[in-house]
From Swiss-Prot:
Localization per Swiss-Prot or TrEMBL: Plastid, Chloroplast
InterPro entries: Ribosomal_uS2, Ribosomal_uS2_bac/mit/plastid, Ribosomal_uS2_CS, Ribosomal_uS2_flav_dom_sf
Gene name tied to this protein: rps2
Family: Belongs to the universal ribosomal protein uS2 family.
NCBIfam families for this protein: rpsB_bact
Main location: plastid
Keywords: Chloroplast, Plastid, Ribonucleoprotein, Ribosomal protein
MF terms (GO), sorted A to Z: mRNA binding; structural constituent of ribosome
Domain of life of the native organism: Eukaryota
CDD domains: RPS2
SUPFAM superfamilies: Ribosomal protein S2
Protein name: Small ribosomal subunit protein uS2c
Gene Ontology CC terms, in alphabetical order: chloroplast; mitochondrial small ribosomal subunit
Any single GO BP term: translation
Length: 221
């Protein structure tokens, strides 16, 4: 159970400048201070706990999860927490069609695995250099989903504004979305919104670790 004091200490309550707000976030706001919207942490705690409970139940039934967060503040913690709980992640650039064109993505994953196992000793220097460039690009794009053999059942999104393409693909396929939603975002863009500061690393660390713990709990049931 997440405590409000923990959220406060991590700066989860600090939203964006009031002039940048999305009016749909009004129900989740506590007040405004010095031109900054302050998020209602009572609601954040409730909705975070609700999301954690959902994850635990879903994962206990064998559902798989994809973490998505490609902006610099989110990249490292997304990889760390997804890896810790044994799930998948995208923390660089979202590949358009990753979910809606899964067959093509599978072929790229196959190509990546082939390159990982390739013997480049017999190649010319130019050929080997070209393959290494291709391999490095695929490493950045694919390493978080290298063992993903089907589309995920749940996608956790840091900043639905930034990851709009991923969110739209999830909606098209009926994939459950859980989003960390700041005051400039639309909470209705995801199935389960967690109102929170999506720019501070401490805030993202706290929330994503809570979600990862819920996944681990589900796997232990």
């Amino acid at each position: 159970m997440m405590k409000i004091q923990q959220l406060l200490e991590a700066g989860v309550h600090l939203g964006h400048q009031a002039k940048r707000w999305n009016p749909k976030m009004l129900p989740y706001l506590y007040t405004q201070r010095m031109g900054i919207h302050i998020i209602d942490l009572v609601q954040t705690a409730h909705l975070l706990n609700q999301a954690c409970e959902t994850l635990t139940v879903q994962v206990s039934e064998g559902k798989r999860v994809l973490f998505v967060g490609t902006k610099p503040q989110a990249s490292v913690v997304v990889e760390e927490e997804a890896t810790r709980c044994g799930e998948f992640f995208i923390n660089q650039r979202w590949l358009g069609g990753l979910l809606t064109n899964w067959t093509t993505v599978q072929s790229r994953l196959k190509r990546w695995r082939e390159l990982l196992e390739a013997d480049m000793d017999h190649l010319t220097k130019k050929e080997a250099s070209a393959l290494r460039r291709e391999l490095n690009q695929l490493n950045r794009q694919m390493r978080g989903i290298q063992n993903m053999d089907q589309i995920p059942d749940i996608v956790i999104v840091v900043d639905p504004n930034k990851e709009n393409t991923a969110v739209l693909e999830c909606h098209k396929l009926g994939i459950l979305t859980i989003g960390i939603v700041d005051t400039n975002a639309d909470p209705e863009s995801v199935d389960l919104a967690i109102p929170a500061n999506d720019d501070a690393i401490a805030s993202l660390q706290l929330i994503l670790s809570c979600l990862a713990d819920a996944i681990l709990k589900g796997k232990s049931i």
